[in-house]
């Protein structure tokens, strides 16, 4: 049994979550906790159920069994506006059919607040995500990586508050289209925010080395089950990764942090 216990100040708690469609169980008996100030990475092979789990943890899907609580309250009991001010979700794909400017897309994140302090919030998150130079461009004309940065700015705008407030941010592969600089910049930013604010970040990552460098804890999902949970040192070992990824790989050490780094054998 995987030990997923963290500190008593858990921001989110999932208890025995299962989800099935037409007799097929996509998520099976997953329990976990995520604490304020934590950065958690969800990893796993293709088809493991990572995106489905993310949707269960954010209330976009109702579990077939089990329940998920945010700040001690079941997700389905939250009022939509209050939930939108407390948690934000960056999905893997966010296409738009209409000619919105970048600033208009980011401003959509402020919908739960009306006009309250929008200008300050937008300027701050656009600067954080390197989007200021993109502000007046048509979102549809951006590269995939630029669109990802805009979507990150949007969800950060959604959670922006003038005073420290417990918040919850979920991201589905937020670095998949980014170049090396912006991968590093994005994960450094998220890490910094969890250290400075009462913010919990949980993101799906395919790059195990990025997960090792920036996550406090890693959740390994396989075949819909949580098969490993712990620090990068505890989860990212050759035996565990070879078993669940079925890849011929090895583990080395980062020359500066000594954290595990994964390489594929030729």
Swiss-Prot record:
Binding residues annotated for ATP, in chain numbering: 44-51
Domain of life: Bacteria
Database matches in InterPro entries: AAA+_ATPase, ABC_transporter-like_ATP-bd, ABC_transporter-like_CS, P-loop_NTPase
Topology relative to the membrane: Peripheral membrane protein
UniProt GO MF annotations: ATP binding; ATP hydrolysis activity
Top-level class of the enzyme under EC nomenclature: translocase
Sorted UniProt keywords: ATP-binding, Cell inner membrane, Cell membrane, Membrane, Nucleotide-binding, Translocase, Transport
Pfam families linked: ABC_tran (PF00005)
Record carries keyword Ribonucleoprotein: no
An annotated GO cellular component: plasma membrane
E.C. code: 7.6.2.-
Compartments, as annotated in UniProt: Cell inner membrane
Keyword Cell membrane: yes
UniProt cross-references to SUPFAM superfamilies, sorted A to Z: P-loop containing nucleoside triphosphate hydrolases (SSF52540)
Domain annotation ABC transporter: ranges: 12-248
Function: Part of the ABC transporter complex HmuTUV involved in hemin import. Responsible for energy coupling to the transport system.
Family statement: Belongs to the ABC transporter superfamily. Heme (hemin) importer (TC 3.A.1.14.5) family.
PANTHER family (alphabetical): HEMIN IMPORT ATP-BINDING PROTEIN HMUV
Assembly, per entry: The complex is composed of two ATP-binding proteins (HmuV), two transmembrane proteins (HmuU) and a solute-binding protein (HmuT).
Protein name according to UniProt: Hemin import ATP-binding protein HmuV
Organism for this UniProt entry: Yersinia enterocolitica
Gene: hmuV
């Amino acid at each position: 049994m995987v030990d997923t216990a963290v500190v008593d100040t858990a921001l989110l708690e999932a208890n025995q979550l299962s989800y099935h469609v037409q007799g097929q169980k996509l998520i099976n008996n997953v329990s976990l906790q995520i604490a304020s100030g934590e950065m958690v990475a969800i990893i796993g092979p293709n088809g493991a159920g990572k995106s489905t789990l993310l949707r269960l943890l954010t209330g976009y899907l109702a579990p077939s069994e089990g329940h998920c609580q945010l700040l001690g309250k079941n997700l389905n009991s939250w009022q939509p506006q209050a939930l939108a001010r407390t948690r934000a979700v960056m999905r893997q794909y966010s296409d738009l059919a209409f000619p919105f400017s970048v600033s208009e897309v980011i401003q959509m994140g402020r919908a739960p607040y009306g006009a309250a302090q929008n200008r300050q919030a937008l300027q701050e998150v656009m600067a954080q995500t390197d989007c200021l130079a993109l502000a007046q461009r048509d979102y549809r004309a951006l590269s995939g990586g630029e669109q990802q940065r805009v979507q990150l700015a949007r969800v950060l705008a959604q959670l922006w508050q003038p005073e420290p407030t417990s918040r919850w941010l979920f991201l589905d592969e937020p670095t998949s289209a980014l170049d090396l600089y912006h991968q590093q910049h994005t994960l450094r930013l998220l890490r910094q925010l969890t250290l400075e604010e009462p913010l919990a970040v949980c993101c799906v990552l395919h790059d195990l080395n990025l997960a090792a460098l920036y996550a406090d804890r890693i959740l390994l999902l396989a075949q819909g089950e949580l098969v490993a949970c712990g620090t990068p040192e505890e989860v990212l070992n050759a035996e565990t990764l070879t078993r669940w990824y079925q890849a011929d790989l090895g583990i080395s050490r980062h020359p500066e942090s000594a954290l595990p780094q994964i390489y594929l054998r030729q």
